[in-house]
Regions:
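Helix-to-loop junction immediately C-terminal to a conserved catalytic motif
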Residues: 49
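Small/aliphatic-rich secondary-structure junction motif
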Residues: 370-421, 426-434, 500-549, 567-580, ...
Length: 643
């Protein structure tokens, strides 16, 4: 293997950039590391080049360990996004720069320079200065300079990111030709999926410092092993189905089970991936090739060049969990996405509102995992309650648990270790892949660090922290609530089951992300849900003035409409639900409804997010935690992509 990364890790302060990444790249291979911002892809490249030192792990190039070697002795060529050409040097001297450092003879430098200029399509431009070249031409020179002294490995960090679309496409083709002719082992990092698919022999998907999956582009797209990759690459229809009796059941339909699907004797819940181009949409009554998925109605269309992109409502899938596309708050019926190259005669028929029939040409089955819970404990009584309830929730979600022990003081480590040991002994039979780890220091900081390095769907707080009672938003809970991107479950008192969930849509509290997340939890647990909205006593108006009846009536209508949309969302998920409206102080009314209705869980939406001690949202959460006699789920507001 030309390049080997062996359990490489890198941290920048509390941020984990790479977490035990292992990778092998074959001789002459063009390997693409694909990931979003902050995934760790550029860090991996810099570590291979010797520009950044890893905290742990080994780097091997051409079979030789190079961790200790400086960049200039690793035999690596590096191409940056911003060209990094010497502006005072001609194109020829830029290309020769590395060869001069390596003391290559003059005649050999000229021969190699002209060979590379011809290869990159810039013959005759050796005497030009970089400022007289276009961006695409400058990047070609940067590639030639990196290849000039014949490195064993070529590393490219978003090399086409600063170029326009047309130039990027041309350069991708040129790079592929050059790489294949020279047979130089190459790693390119990018966030551009089209670029990755066009160039790569294999792709590695990086997410939060984890190398999630590696494979040829077509295999990763059509047969991913994980939900994360299925959703990350392109668009996806991802539904929950069941293999039963050797057949695949999705909603009311029975679909053809792929040959590579697991063979089971009883039944097995799975995720069903249907790419938009594999979903056949035809006018009702027309002949159809795939396996029938039912009748539907076109909701939206968009002509993107020759491809017709459609959103299609499919009533027969009502109650079937659809993981992608994400449900929209208030959506009345299940929606799938389809891409088609329709025949000319079909174009006037495939329009919004048109009744259609759907069929599946090809699909892929992914093992179903119901979610990942991070349970944080400190060996206290609160930790025991939280762990017990978290285990029940994880079991009902068909998910997995990881347990983080936190010791804020050195004399607390023994208790934390004992708690972890007892947890491993008590729950490993139910969760065979159960992992535990111990962290010392501020509980809130350690929890947030673990959330940053792992991919979790929920965090369960079973540690008090040094300040604040277990029932209030003390330092640990407050810090995690304000900064966590995943829902937080706090267990002041445990319940024996999860059959009734109260989802609060009180004034000032987010009412979309919490409805969708709590609805998914209710669907997995087979629980009923109640949507609650609290009308505050004070209405908008002049100070001291009586409430305007027209304003009050308008707010009631708005509340009813909002609750009705929430009920539609829950019904779409197959969750039995009802709505209630109370009037008064939000926290008091939530607590009274929870008590009188004997709910097993209260779900609250955090503000966007609460960032100060005086935040109304934080005050409401604090009061509910102080007096609730049941678990409380706090769902953060969704963050903008890229944050």
């Amino acid at each position: 293997m030309s390049i080997v990364l062996d359990h490489v890790s890198k941290r920048f302060g509390a941020h984990v950039a790479l977490d035990e990444v292992s990778l092998e790249v074959a001789d002459s291979e063009l390997f693409v590391l694909l990931g979003g911002s902050g995934s760790g892809k550029s860090t991996a490249l810099r570590i291979i080049a010797g520009l950044t030192r890893p905290d742990e792990g080994r780097i091997l190039l051409q079979g030789e360990r190079v961790d200790h070697l400086p960049p200039q002795k690793r035999g690596v060529g590096f191409v940056f996004q911003n060209y990094s050409l010497f502006q005072h040097m001609t194109v020829g001297r830029n290309i020769e720069f590395g060869m001069r450092i390596h003391k290559v003879p003059h005649a050999e430098r000229l021969r190699r320079r002209e060979e590379l200029l011809n290869l990159i399509g810039l013959e005759g431009m050796a005497d030009r200065l970089p400022r007289r070249l276009s961006g695409g031409q400058q990047q070609r020179v940067a590639v030639a300079r990196a290849l000039a002294y014949q490195p064993a490995v070529l590393l490219m960090d978003e090399p086409f990111g600063a170029l326009d679309v047309r130039t990027r496409s041309q350069l991708r083709r040129s790079l592929k030709e050059v790489q294949q002719k020279l047979k130089v082992t190459t790693i390119l990092v990018t966030h551009d999926q089209e670029e990755a698919f066009e160039l790569a022999d294999r792709i590695g998907i990086l997410e939060r410092g984890h190398l999630v999956e590696v494979g040829p582009p077509a295999s990763l797209y059509r047969r991913p092993k994980t939900e994360l990759v299925a959703r990350f690459l392109g668009e996806a229809n991802l539904l929950v189905g069941e293999i039963r009796g050797g057949r695949l059941h999705v909603g009311e339909s029975i679909l053809t089970l792929p040959a590579e699907a697991p063979q089971v004797t009883g039944s097995l819940e799975v995720k069903v991936l249907i790419r938009p181009e594999e979903l056949e949409v035809r006018p009702r009554g027309a002949s159809i090739d795939g396996k029938g998925l039912g009748l539907g109605k076109i909701l939206e269309t968009l002509q993107a060049g020759p491809v017709l992109r459609m959103k299609v409502g499919v009533p027969s899938l009502r109650g079937t969990p659809i993981l992608s596309p994400e449900p929209v708050f208030g959506q009345a019926e299940p929606t799938l996405i389809a891409h088609a190259l329709p025949e000319i005669g079909e174009l006037p028929v495939l329009v919004p509102g048109a009744p259609v029939q759907l069929a599946v040409r090809n699909l892929h089955v992914i093992p179903h995992e119901g979610g990942s819970l991070l349970v944080c404990i400190d060996g206290s009584e609160l930790a025991g309650r939280s762990l017990d309830f978290a285990a029940r929730v994880a079991a009902q979600m068909h998910g997995r648990m990881e347990i983080l022990g936190v010791a804020e003081k050195p004399n607390e480590e023994t208790r934390a270790r004992e708690g972890l040991s007892a947890a491993l002994q008590g729950y490993s039979s139910e969760f065979p892949s159960l992992k535990t780890r111990l962290r010392a220091g501020n509980a809130g900081d350690r929890i947030l660090e673990e959330l940053d390095r792992g991919v979790y769907d929920m965090v369960v707080l079973g540690c008090r922290g040094r300040h604040g009672p277990a029932r209030s938003m003390g330092s640990t809970t407050g810090k995690v609530v304000m900064q966590s991107r995943v829902p937080i479950l706090i267990v002041p008192e445990a319940r024996r089951s999860l059959k009734k969930i109260l989802i609060c849509m009180a004034s000032g509290v987010s009412g979309r992300s919490d409805v969708i997340f709590a609805g998914r939890l209710a669907g997995r647990a087979g629980a009923q849900a109640t949507l609650l909205h609290v009308m505050e006593g004070d209405q908008p108006g002049l100070p001291g003035a009586a409430p305007d009846p027209r304003t009050t009536e308008y707010l009631r209508e708005l509340t009813t409409e909002r609750l009705a949309r929430g009920i539609l969302t829950l019904k779409l998920m197959g969750v039995p639900s009802e709505m209630k409206v109370r009037q008064g102080v939000a926290a008091a009314e939530i607590l009274e409804e929870a008590r009188s209705g004997d709910y097993d869980l209260i779900a609250l939406g955090a503000l966007e997010p609460p960032r100060s001690e005086d935040s109304d949202g934080r005050a409401l959460i604090d009061v509910v935690l102080e007096h609730a006699r049941r678990p409380v789920l706090i769902v953060p507001a969704p963050q903008e992509k890229g944050t």
